[in-house]
Amino acid sequence: NYEIKLVGCPAEEIIPLSYENGGGGGKIKLINEGVFKNTAYSMMIHPATRNEVDPLMIAVKQIDIEFYGKAAHASGSAYVGKNALDAQILAYNNISALRQQLQPVEKVHGIITHGGESPNIIPDYTRSSWMIRAQETKDLKKLEKKILNCFKGAAESTSCKLNVVEGNGTYENLVTDKKLKKIF
């Protein structure tokens, strides 16, 4: 006695900054709301350029990073400021240096989404958005610690305050059921 359900999942992927207005992370929301409770098997169908029964879908997490400093006039009194943009740039460079030590399937992507208000003002606030990826969820957790250390080091060296804004959660890596794989 099995019941077959077809569940559509809009906004199923993590979209940078989307969690602020409720978008993205649809699969995580469905799981948290119990849509898959008492489900024996689950299949995912995703449009692609080719058919694959066992695709590599790695774990991913999205976070935003905020640095808070102290504004100052860049020409007249820069020495009294705490440059939040310097913190972002150092964090970005720390991660760039870390990349040579990462496994090929470990990925870190980031952009600065807010770098300041005016070039003649030392920025007191900056924000960046990051996606962290690894082959398995356990590896993602280890990689996230390394990435957070890059941000902490940048905050420490610039005397800025660091704030980590979590996304909708972690997408764990896809694990294909071997029995279903053979049947499909």
Tell where the protein language model's regions lie, with residue ranges.
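Proteins with a high burden of low-complexity, intrinsically disordered sequence enriched in S/T/G/P/A and R
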Residues: 1-4, 159-161
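Histidine/acidic-residue-rich, glycine-tolerant segments that coordinate divalent metal ions
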Residues: 2-122
